[in-house]
Amino acid sequence: MINSYKDSGVDKEEGYKAVELMKKNVLKTHNKSVLTNLGSFGAMYELGQYKNPVLISGTDGVGTKLEIAMKQKKYDTVGIDCVAMCVNDVLCHGAKPLFFLDYLACGKLDAEVAAQLVSGVTEGCLQSYAALVGGETAEMPGFYKEGDYDIAGFCVGIVEKEDLIDGSKVKEGNKIIAVASSGFHSNGYSLVRKVFTDYNEKIFLKEYGENVTMGDVLLTPTKIYVKPILKVLEKFNVNGMAHITGGGLFENLPRCMGKNLSPVVFKDKVRVPEIFKLIAERSKIKEEELFGTFNMGVGFTLVVEEKDVETIIELLTSLGETAYEIGHIEKGDHSLCLK
């Protein structure tokens, strides 16, 4: 006999508790442009003083990295990942993130877990100037197993039309600057999980130190590049930018330039972190496929004039980033050449 909605597997009271736990963190991200309080049907955001604004949108999720989070019972870092995957994409066009919305789905809602996830989303928003203006938490018993969660996000950014970066200014002879990743970011985890399923924890700790677990390394959040890259854009003209996600350098770097151009990357210049070398050793996957699956230590790239390379690298270094030149642009068929 079903006597209440709760008997079907949906606990509204747990949902109310989750909202209360989230509120404080969410409100930390709000600014004077946010015109609505939590609970409104739609979020309102005032654009302010822009002459000819262009809105840039992006949406993404975290993928199977969530399974590691669920096994480790650590959920905050994947909230940061969710934001990073979206804001880094809109950043590629020169846009400053304005606001963010999240979507959380689960089999059985645990208010504490939901709050932990959203605390990570909040942290990601604070790192990227984005206001967390809304979201949806969907408890879906029978669709998801108890203990399973999925999270996705949606971001809107803004840029003046004359400052829009669309790749049309990229030309032969431009140089490619790499900005280091923090690890796997949020891509390639189906392979990562397969490779490390039976991996010897002691060997792993020897590589990274006694106080670092495999979970710590695999759950390192995706780096958010918004603040340092916007600083670069204040001082320099950047012709193209690429967020290196699924498909690695092979799929993502060509996206920021015209079809008649090809990026050339010198693999001996790419500073590949040890974790990727461990993947190579454990899987025996060919080098080219690794570069076409993972970021291989390069999380973001800028295509710039040769005269600006040194000073841009100096600026990024002063902002705490690891940046270095990895290649250039040639006439070609739009495919990446790894030399």
UniProtKB/Swiss-Prot annotation:
Pfam families: AIRS (PF00586), AIRS_C (PF02769). One of its GO terms (biological process) is purine nucleotide biosynthetic process. It comes from the Bacteria. SUPFAM superfamilies: PurM C-terminal domain-like, PurM N-terminal domain-like. Pathway: Purine metabolism; IMP biosynthesis via de novo pathway; 5-amino-1-(5-phospho-D-ribosyl)imidazole from N(2)-formyl-N(1)-(5-phospho-D-ribosyl)glycinamide: step 2/2. It catalyses: 2-formamido-N(1)-(5-O-phospho-beta-D-ribosyl)acetamidine + ATP = 5-amino-1-(5-phospho-beta-D-ribosyl)imidazole + ADP + phosphate + H(+). The keyword 4Fe-4S does not apply. Keywords: ATP-binding, Cytoplasm, Ligase, Nucleotide-binding, Purine biosynthesis. HAMAP family: AIRS (MF_00741). NCBIfam families: purM. This is Phosphoribosylformylglycinamidine cyclo-ligase. It comes from Fusobacterium nucleatum subsp. nucleatum (strain ATCC 25586 / DSM 15643 / BCRC 10681 / CIP 101130 / JCM 8532 / KCTC 2640 / LMG 13131 / VPI 4355). The gene is purM.
